[in-house]
Regions:
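N-terminal alpha-helical interaction modules that lie
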Residues: 1-56, 174-190
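Hydrophobic/aromatic packing residues within the alpha-helices of TPR/SEL1-like helical repeat arrays
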Residues: 27-31, 65, 100, 135
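Alpha-helical adaptor scaffolds
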Residues: 41-117
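TPR/TPR-like (Sel1-like) alpha-helical repeat modules
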Residues: 105-108, 124-146, 159, 174-180
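Boundary/linker segments of alpha-helical solenoid repeat arrays
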Residues: 73-78, 107-115, 140-154, 183-188
Length: 190
């Protein structure tokens, strides 16, 4: 039975040694053996794919992310995001952009974590305007829900994007300023 603890240990060892290929190979083999009761096979393939990306082997990563999608089991993150990252790394820009469109059309703009991941991916690709749209959608999704940790990340990302785009401060940027003030003076903002 696969466990997240086992995969965590493999990831920590890979980070310590820098040998992500070894971790990716091991995780890929373990993912095939996944059974009921532990980590989902889809999540195992996702984590293996992430290690393949860290090992600079996006082709193997694509295979693992596609297996995660085909398995359709539960995953911590949407496998289409890292699959798009691997596609970009392979120069398959049209395929990667199609995945981002698919995410948008499937309602991912209501999921703060996915918005954060897509915004980061698009920032890496230099598409700051679209990244800003995703970050803004993520902030709005957080404000409708309870995800305050993701809200902080999205507000910071959104602020950096707006600065890079030369845009003036807006109400969401001011929320970030209020959070800074509250950390400096807990009585502020009450």
């Amino acid at each position: 039975m696969l466990s997240s603890e086992l995969f965590d240990a493999i990831e920590v060892n890979a980070a310590r040694t820098g040998n992500h290929k070894r971790a990716a190979v091991r995780m890929s083999r373990l993912a095939v053996q996944a059974s009921q009761g532990g980590m989902s096979r889809a999540e195992a393939h996702m984590r293996a794919g992430e290690q393949w990306l860290l090992a600079d082997d996006p082709e193997e990563a694509v295979e693992q992310f596609q297996k995660a999608m085909a398995d359709a089991g539960p995953t911590f993150d949407d496998p289409r995001v890292p699959l798009a990252r691997a596609m970009f790394a392979l120069g398959r820009t049209d395929d990667a952009e199609a995945l981002v469109r698919e995410l948008r059309e499937s309602g991912a703009l209501t999921q703060p974590r996915t918005c954060d991941l897509v915004a980061e991916l698009l920032t890496e690709q230099g598409d700051l305007r679209t990244a800003l749209d995703w970050a803004t959608a993520g902030v709005e999704a957080c404000l409708r829900g309870e995800d305050r940790d993701e809200l902080k990340l999205l507000l910071r990302l959104r602020y950096r994007l707006r600065v890079d785009l030369g845009l003036p401060e807006d109400d969401y940027d001011k929320m970030l300023d209020n959070k800074k003030a509250q950390r400096a003076d807990p009585a502020a903002g009450k």
